[in-house]
C-alpha cells in the first residue's frame, strides 16, 4: 500500500479543474460537494480542493479543512476509480465536526446513491 500524497495525485492547473467542472457530474451533502470526471487515463485518481474565503475567513481554518480532506484521500486513494475529483467545501467544519466531514466525503466519493446524496446536473 502506498500512502503517499505525491504530485501525481493532485490537480494543479486551472485546465485540470475546468475539465472536471465541464463534466457537470456533481454530488453534494451538507458540508461538501464533489465533482468528478469520467476518467483521466492515468490509472490513478487525482484530487483538487476548493475552500473559499466565504467558507472560512481565517487561513488556518481553510488549511485544516484541506488537510482533513487530503488525509482522507491519501488513505483511500487505492479504493477510488482512476478519475479526477474536485472537492468543494460548502460549510465550515472544525475538529468537532471533522468526523462528519470524513463520512460525507466517503459517501460522495464512493458514489452510493442510497446514501441520500443530492445529484446535481
Curated annotation (Swiss-Prot):
Q: What Enzyme Commission number does this protein have?
A: 3.1.26.5
Query: Which InterPro entries does the entry link to?
Result: Ribosomal_Su5_D2-typ_SF (IPR020568), Ribsml_uS5_D2-typ_fold_subgr (IPR014721), RNase_P (IPR000100), RNase_P_CS (IPR020539)
Source species of the chain: Neisseria meningitidis serogroup B (strain ATCC BAA-335 / MC58)
BP GO terms, sorted: tRNA 3'-end processing; tRNA 5'-leader removal
Subunit (UniProt): Consists of a catalytic RNA component (M1 or rnpB) and a protein subunit.
- Where does it sit, as one GO cellular component term? ribonuclease P complex
Full protein name: Ribonuclease P protein component
| Keywords per UniProt | Endonuclease, Hydrolase, Nuclease, RNA-binding, tRNA processing
Q: What does this protein do?
A: RNaseP catalyzes the removal of the 5'-leader sequence from pre-tRNA to produce the mature 5'-terminus. It can also cleave other RNA substrates such as 4.5S RNA. The protein component plays an auxiliary but essential role in vivo by binding to the 5'-leader sequence and broadening the substrate specificity of the ribozyme.
GO molecular function per UniProt? 3'-tRNA processing endoribonuclease activity; ribonuclease P activity; tRNA binding
Going by the record, the broad EC class of this enzyme is hydrolase
Which one Pfam family would you cite for this protein?
Answer: Ribonuclease_P
- Which catalytic reaction applies to this protein? Endonucleolytic cleavage of RNA, removing 5'-extranucleotides from tRNA precursor
Family assignment?
A: Belongs to the RnpA family.
Amino acid at each position: 500500500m502506498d500512502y503517499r500524497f505525491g504530485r501525481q495525485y493532485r490537480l494543479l492547473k486551472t485546465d485540470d479543474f475546468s475539465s472536471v467542472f465541464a463534466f457537470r457530474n456533481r454530488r453534494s451533502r451538507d458540508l461538501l460537494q464533489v465533482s468528478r470526471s469520467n476518467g483521466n487515463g492515468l490509472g490513478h485518481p487525482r484530487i483538487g480542493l476548493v475552500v473559499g474565503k466565504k467558507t472560512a475567513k481565517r487561513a488556518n481554518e481553510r488549511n485544516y479543512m484541506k488537510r482533513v480532506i487530503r488525509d482522507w484521500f491519501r488513505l483511500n486513494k487505492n479504493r477510488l476509480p482512476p478519475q479526477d475529483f474536485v472537492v468543494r467545501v460548502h460549510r465550515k467544519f472544525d475538529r468537532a465536526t471533522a468526523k462528519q466531514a470524513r463520512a460525507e466525503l466517503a459517501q460522495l466519493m464512493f458514489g452510493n446513491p442510497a446514501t441520500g446524496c443530492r445529484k446535481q446536473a
